[in-house]
A protein has these predicted regions:
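Phosphate-binding site of ATP-dependent enzymes
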Residues: 162-245, 252, 256-264
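Aromatic/hydrophobic pocket-lining residues that form π-stacking "cages" and hydrophobic walls in ligand
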Residues: 79, 173, 269
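ATP-dependent carboxylate activation and anion-phosphoryl transfer catalytic cores
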Residues: 115, 139, 256-272
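ATP-binding N-terminal substructure of ATP-dependent carboxylate-amine bond-forming enzymes
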Residues: 1-96, 100-106, 125-135
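Active-site nucleotide/adenylate-binding loops and adjacent lid/helix of ATP-dependent enzymes
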Residues: 1, 55-59, 98-194, 204-205
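A short, local hydrophobic-aromatic micro-motif
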Residues: 3, 91, 119-120, 187, ...
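Short, acidic Gly/Pro/Ser/Thr-rich loop/turn segments
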Residues: 12, 73-74, 157, 205-207, ...
């Protein structure tokens, strides 16, 4: 039996059959009226979902958690740490892997230690920049060549990311990024970029690699709008590599890269 649980942006947990209807997520007030506001805890050998409020009662019990989640506090190790502290089994990455997977700086530092190829980068905390913006700008430009791409280190979905071709644009990009995160990553922009994705499933002893996906973008990077809105529509499109040249697709599966490059992508993914 699948028991749906929804975590709101204000960190409240809800459960109920109504959550199986995707339309209900368009109206949060309706969702909250129809679902049960609950907390998860361990009681007498069971993991229970108990209702909040005056009349507290056990709404359901669960055996294992499937964190099918996206965003801050749920895919960055916070939720995984909570589940682990309670003791409930859960699928997917553990706390450490979730943290490293979400923090771009941590990930790059680990890749560097393993001699994996990465783009030239630097990073800083917002207070370091705010204390002396000119000094930090000079440090960045001494280490990296323009154009650069500025990213909040711990966010996803391309939120807060900007490309800077000039020093003035770099300042604007940083000012934008620090409104989203206190930790900022700056990388040299890869020119004539062909962006590909590959997934691994399993662990270091036994894993499988996915097909390689090519990301199609009209910008210097795949933007939030392209990822989720797609030419004014909800989401981009996916086509095969044999699709029409005129198709305005966001992704191409499999990627249209040569066999040698495909093997290199698989090799690096396996090492990572």
């Amino acid at each position: 039996e699948v028991i749906p649980i929804y975590i709101t942006k204000d960190r409240e947990w809800y459960t109920g059959e109504c959550l199986k209807d995707i339309e209900i997520y368009k109206d949060m007030a309706l969702l909250k009226r129809n679902a049960k506001n609950v907390v998860l805890y361990y009681r007498k050998g069971e993991f229970v979902l108990q209702s909040k409020g005056l009349l507290r009662r056990v709404v359901n019990t669960i055996d294992i958690a499937f964190p099918i989640v996206h965003g801050t506090n749920v895919e960055d190790g916070v939720l995984q740490g909570y589940l682990q502290s309670i003791g409930i089994p859960f699928v997917g990455s553990d706390v450490y892997a979730s943290v490293v997977g979400q923090d771009k700086v941590f990930m790059k530092e680990i890749f560097e230690c393993e001699n994996l190829p990465i783009v030239n980068y630097t990073w800083f905390f917002d207070h370091e920049y705010l204390e002396d913006p000119e000094k930090e700008i000079k440090r960045i430009l001494k280490k990296l060549e323009l154009p650069v791409i500025v990213k909040p280190a711990k966010l996803g979905s391309s939120v807060g990311i900007s490309v800077a071709h000039t020093e003035e644009e770099l300042k604007e990009a940083i000012d934008n990024a620090i409104t989203y995160d206190e930790k900022i990553l700056v990388e040299e922009l890869v020119k004539n970029l062909v962006e590909v994705n590959i997934s691994t499933l399993g662990n270091h002893e036994n894993f499988e690699l996915s097909e390689i996906e090519e990301v199609m973008s009209a910008e210097d990077f795949l933007t939030y709008q392209e990822k989720y809105l797609g030419n004014g529509k909800k989401g981009g499109t996916i086509t095969s590599s044999k699709g029409s040249k005129n198709a305005r697709s966001s992704h191409k599966i499999p990627a249209s890269i040569d066999d040698k490059l495909k093997e290199e992508v698989r090799r690096v993914a396996s090492m990572a």
